[in-house]
């Protein structure tokens, strides 16, 4: 018997987030699962709320997951999207650039996303860590852990304008920016690719009597069902999958290398103010 609603936390990186979680709330309530959600302005606040017991589940960014596990080593990732698995980030140059290898970026300007973006900053810069580059960060949506792609888009614009020699971005965003015209189609070239990594997950710290039911209903969502497909499209997936954690090792190493969080989950990045 569920004694209280399962409360989920999510970060309001875009106005559509309200529509998404209102839709999920209707989905769960229609299946007799008491459910509610709370929105946060940034991930650090959400992680602290999860660890502090103010919410039961957090829809966490990969960086938020890293911090959650440092603050609460027994934390679990219970589910994720099919589109959260096996992503890559790329370092891109203009097609006419003389740069052919990452080492040739030494001494040159490289544009990145916000300081807290795993895919637009931390992971690609870890790839370039042994190359002395001039980092130019485009600080859009700080605290949103890269969910707002504005920083990556601004880095891409700087690349197209010749203001930087290279730009870092999620591989999927490289395709998006070329499609939307931010980058000229065929006008860029990839010079480095990160190993595969995973993105968001539903994180839990403490048990709740409705948690198993929540996961079961989540995994049962069917993209072929016209009632749930629009909601899944908004959240950018075709299937929910069980959570896994081995796709975050690369980010854990980058967090340590750049001192973003301390070993106990304390925020340590210089000048980071979400």
Where are these regions (language model features)?
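Bilobed "Venus flytrap"/periplasmic-binding protein-like clamshell domains
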Residues: 5-31, 40, 63, 87-155, ...
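Short, hydrophobic alpha-helical packing/hinge segments within bilobed ligand-binding/sensory domains
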Residues: 45-49, 151-158, 164
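N-terminal hydrophobic or amphipathic helices and topogenic motifs
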Residues: 1-54, 60-62, 226-274
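Conserved functional loop/turn residues at catalytic and ligand-binding sites
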Residues: 54, 109, 163
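Generic structural signal for residues in well-ordered beta-strands
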Residues: 35-37, 135, 190
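A ligand-binding cleft/hinge motif common to bilobed small-molecule-binding domains
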Residues: 59-72, 129, 157-186
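Periplasmic-binding protein-like
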Residues: 2-10, 81-93, 145-146, 180-218, ...
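Acidic, polar ligand-binding/catalytic clefts
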Residues: 49-104, 116
């Amino acid at each position: 018997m569920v004694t209280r609603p399962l409360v989920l936390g999510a970060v309001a990186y875009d106005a559509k987030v309200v529509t998404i979680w209102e839709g999920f709330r209707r989905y769960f309530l229609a299946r007799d699962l008491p459910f509610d959600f709370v929105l946060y302005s940034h991930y650090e606040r959400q992680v602290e709320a999860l660890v502090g017991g103010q919410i039961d589940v957090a829809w966490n960014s990969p960086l938020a997951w890293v911090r959650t596990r440092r603050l609460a080593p027994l934390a679990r990732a219970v589910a994720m999207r099919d589109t959260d698995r096996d992503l890559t980030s790329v370092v891109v140059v203009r097609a006419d650039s003389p740069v052919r290898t990452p080492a040739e970026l030494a001494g040159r300007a490289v544009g990145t996303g916000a300081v807290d973006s795993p895919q637009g900053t931390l992971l690609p810069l870890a790839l370039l860590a042994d190359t002395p580059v001039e980092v130019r960060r485009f600080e859009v949506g700080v605290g949103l852990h890269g969910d707002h792609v504005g920083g990556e888009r601004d880095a891409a614009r700087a690349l197209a304008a010749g203001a930087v020699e290279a730009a870092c971005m999620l591989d999927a965003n490289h395709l998006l920016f070329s499609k939307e015209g931010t980058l000229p189609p065929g006008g860029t070239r990839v010079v480095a690719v990160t190993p595969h990594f995973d993105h968001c997950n539903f994180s839990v710290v403490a048990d709740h009597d409705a948690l198993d039911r929540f996961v079961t209903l989540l995994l049962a969502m069917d993209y072929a069902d016209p009632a749930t497909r629009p909601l899944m499209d908004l959240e950018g997936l075709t299937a929910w999958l069980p959570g896994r954690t081995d796709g975050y090792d690369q980010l854990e190493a980058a967090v340590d290398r750049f001192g973003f969080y301390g070993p106990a989950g304390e925020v340590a990045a210089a000048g980071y103010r979400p």
